[in-house]
Amino acid sequence: MSCKLKVKGQYIKDLSFENPNSPQIFLMISKTPPEINISINVSSVSLPVKAQDQSSEQPSDNKVEPLYEVTLQVNAEARVGTTVAFICEIKYCGVFSIESDDVSIEELSQQDIRDVLLISAPTILFPFVRELISRVTSTGGFPPLMLDIVDFRAMYESQMKQGVGQNDNSQDPEK
């Protein structure tokens, strides 16, 4: 089954940078490089959209194109020993619609939708998050933090095997 995402918009939902131990931390990191811990989470929700809410480019057959918000959350914390150097947290979102050349959107399986929302969508959003974190850490007085590329498919599959799953509410806007 071939699903394609259409990006309808993307934005920063939440961005925080803390530099709680400045200026002393700059002397500390000149002697000892900080240890950096990064966590990444992906979630999606179905957006409640009414037919009249959509733009005029919508076909006139009164079908509603489902929209989904995907959130890529990255938390980075740098420490020198037990001293916090910085904490950077971002929630970066994209609003997407899903298309398929093979079948109508109603005929797509839950798994196909989940895969495209939790693998393909964060892959699209990641370069923007990576650049924002690099800029914010640099503006905070630290060397730019360049995140390694993330294999969202491997991350998703690993979490599914562990039974953890990602926070996916893509089919139930009430969650």
Curated annotation (Swiss-Prot):
Gene3D superfamilies to which the protein is assigned, alphabetical: SecB-like (3.10.420.10)
Superkingdom to which the source organism belongs: Bacteria
Subunit structure, interactors included: Homotetramer, a dimer of dimers. One homotetramer interacts with 1 SecA dimer.
GO cellular component: a single term: cytoplasm
Protein name: Protein-export protein SecB
Classification via SUPFAM superfamilies: SecB-like
Localization (cell): Cytoplasm
Organism, scientific name: Ehrlichia chaffeensis (strain ATCC CRL-10679 / Arkansas)
Similarity comment: Belongs to the SecB family.
GO BP terms in the entry: protein folding; protein tetramerization; protein transport
Primary role: One of the proteins required for the normal export of preproteins out of the cell cytoplasm. It is a molecular chaperone that binds to a subset of precursor proteins, maintaining them in a translocation-competent state. It also specifically binds to its receptor SecA.
InterPro entries: SecB, SecB-like_sf
Keywords, alphabetical: Chaperone, Cytoplasm, Protein transport, Translocation, Transport
GO molecular function, one term: unfolded protein binding
